[in-house]
From Swiss-Prot:
This is D-aminoacyl-tRNA deacylase. It is found in: Cytoplasm. It comes from the Bacteria. One of its GO terms (molecular function) is Ser(Gly)-tRNA(Ala) hydrolase activity. The lineage of its organism: Bacteria, Bacillati, Bacillota, Bacilli, Bacillales. Its EC number is 3.1.1.96. It comes from Bacillus cytotoxicus (strain DSM 22905 / CIP 110041 / 391-98 / NVH 391-98). Homodimer. One of its GO terms (biological process) is D-amino acid catabolic process. The keyword Transcription does not apply. Keywords: Cytoplasm, Hydrolase, RNA-binding, tRNA-binding. A Gly-cisPro motif from one monomer fits into the active site of the other monomer to allow specific chiral rejection of L-amino acids. It is an enzyme of class 3 (hydrolase).
């Protein structure tokens, strides 16, 4: 499992001209799932993200987690994170999980984040989405389970 995490001042996701998910501030997650991922991978990353100290304290040091600052999460499914661009000019997406498996694990992942005590907004799995955000910092990290 691979998640691109962006600390965001605000973020939203739109499908067919309608906002389907929106947060005032917190983390925007682009979530990629491969066919080898399990619920254990999803739970590991959910716990890791909830407790990563990437928000600044009063001294400007990254000492607070999203739980500490009472932020929210915007989670977006993103199979293209497993695009392999090493050969040719078109990405190969064979490492991305099949949609039915990926959707189930994506839903499980979002529930695991909620179990950590966070409010989670999502996009629409499998849809073409427009994602807007104001990246805070910018702070962008890649979190992987393997």
């Amino acid at each position: 499992m691979r998640v691109v995490l962006q600390r965001s001042k605000e973020a939203s996701v739109t499908v067919d001209g309608e906002i389907v998910g929106q947060i005032p501030f917190g983390l925007t997650l682009l979530v990629g799932i491969t066919h080898e991922d399990t619920e254990q991978d999803a739970a590991y990353i959910a716990e890791k993200i909830a407790n990563l100290r990437i928000f600044e304290d009063e001294n400007g040091k990254m000492n607070h987690s999203i739980l500490d600052v009472k932020g929210q999460v915007l989670s977006i499914s993103q199979f293209t994170l497993y695009g392999d661009c090493r050969k040719g000019r078109r990405p190969n997406f064979m490492n991305a999980a099949k949609p039915d498996y990926a959707e189930r694990l994506y839903d499980f992942f979002n529930e695991e984040i909620r179990k950590q005590g966070l409010h989670v907004e999502t996009g629409k799995f499998g849809a073409m989405m427009d994602v807007s955000l104001v990246n805070d910092g910018p702070v962008t990290l890649i979190v992987e389970s393997k």
